[in-house]
Amino acid sequence: MKELLEVMVRNLVSIQEDVNVVKEEDDNSIVLKLSVNKEDIGKIIGKNGKVIRSIRTVVKAGAYNTKKRVVVEIME
C-alpha cells in the first residue's frame, strides 16, 4: 500500500523527490502519512478534495485483503 500511494502521488506532483510516505501499523489499522512539497499540496487535494478522495479509495481497495482500516493523512 505504501508503494502504491507513492507511485500514484509521484505521477501527480511536479517535485517528485519531495514525496515521502511513512507507514504506521497497529492491530486494527494502517496509517499512511503523506508529505509533499508545499507547491504540490493543491494538486494532491484537488478541487473540493476530489483527488485525495480518489487516492484514498484506491489505497483502501488495495488493502482490502488485509482486513485493516487504512487512513491516508496529508502532512504539512
Mark where each language-model region is.
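Ordered, soluble secondary-structure elements with a strong preference for glycine-centered loop motifs
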Residues: 42-53
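RNA-contacting regions in translation and RNA-metabolism proteins
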Residues: 1-43, 57-76
